[in-house]
Amino acid sequence: SRILYVTGLKDYVMIYLEGEVRPLITHVTMKAMEEMLSTGRFMRVHRSYIVALDKIRSVDRNNCVYIGKEIIHVTDAYKEAFNAYLKAAQPS
């Protein structure tokens, strides 16, 4: 998948792809998009953002995700699940 992240605006989402300057815009809710992408490769980290887990470059102490050229803040509602993913993804 070339999807870096998805951002939502009411009943539309913008899908940002690797190598593309402009996002794809489609008429679908974030909830519906989250269900379509829920393969374990994507995670919602904010009310308005879903990120491709394999495209994350880094995460800082303030739970900001660096993906592509974007910095996305992981909000409190999603922080616990995201931190659990990070722990599980770390090599033992």
Across the structure, where does each feature detected by a protein language model lie?
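Hydrophobic side chains in well-ordered alpha-helices
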Residues: 33, 82-85
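Conserved binding/recognition cores within well-folded domains
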Residues: 1-67, 73-74
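Generic C-terminal helix-cap and adjacent flexible tail
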Residues: 87-92
